[in-house]
Amino acid sequence: MPEFKIVISDPEAKADLPVYKVKVKGDESIEYGDDEKNQRKLPVCKLNPKLLEKLNAVHGIVTVRIRKEDRKFNYTCKATADANVPEDTVHVSLEWLGDKVGAEEAEGEVFRAKAWQITITSPAADQLIGLKIGDTFDGGLVGLPGYKLLIRGGSDNSGFPMLPSIPGPVKKRVLLSGPPGFHPREKGERRRKTVRGNTITHDIVQINTVIVYPKKE
């Protein structure tokens, strides 16, 4: 039974989009069960409707970031509008917050999510078997109905990357001069590496995708 970790990138979540400082509060009413911990679905967070509008989170997905000493913790979540939450505050799972920072409240920031991950299994995952790098599939499989996701690459359970230039559901050793699969330390350096072909098989564990938006005229 195939299981794929789908990495979703949002090309319209630019680096210059607004970032707002917020108080992050743990909310015991927000569920953080096995599905959320195993990334089968995004956890929920609660935001004031005015803050959610400012973030311009088209898909309703935001990232809450907390910095503690020299570490940072990201909580990418499906935002729910709640007028009872102050505009400068975000509510997240109390269990998650306590586990990460050992407190019920913390200082943080929130912004439109640039990327996130969802894990899918059969029967949804079966629909991706045989697709190739450059193909698209229905975003509804990962909670993005109405959008297509473009396959950009992936890797197997040994970390061997899929290469667009290698046709078929294969694994082979090839001579590489650059990524994916090899990052040369010197100009002109080449190395023989094991890679996967451009086709998704049961051996693939991660699929890298990007959201396809309508072309702007």
Curated annotation (Swiss-Prot):
<dbReference type="InterPro" id="IPR018282">
    <property type="entry name" value="Ribosomal_eS6_CS"/>
</dbReference>
<keyword id="KW-0689">Ribosomal protein</keyword>
<dbReference type="InterPro" id="IPR020924">
    <property type="entry name" value="Ribosomal_eS6_arc"/>
</dbReference>
<keyword id="KW-0687">Ribonucleoprotein</keyword>
<dbReference type="GO" id="GO:0003735">
    <property type="term" value="F:structural constituent of ribosome"/>
</dbReference>
<dbReference type="InterPro" id="IPR001377">
    <property type="entry name" value="Ribosomal_eS6"/>
</dbReference>
<dbReference type="GO" id="GO:0006412">
    <property type="term" value="P:translation"/>
</dbReference>
<dbReference type="GO" id="GO:0005840">
    <property type="term" value="C:ribosome"/>
</dbReference>
<protein>
    <recommendedName>
        <fullName>Small ribosomal subunit protein eS6</fullName>
    </recommendedName>
</protein>
<dbReference type="GO" id="GO:1990904">
    <property type="term" value="C:ribonucleoprotein complex"/>
</dbReference>
<dbReference type="Pfam" id="PF01092">
    <property type="entry name" value="Ribosomal_S6e"/>
</dbReference>
<comment type="similarity">
    <text>Belongs to the eukaryotic ribosomal protein eS6 family.</text>
</comment>
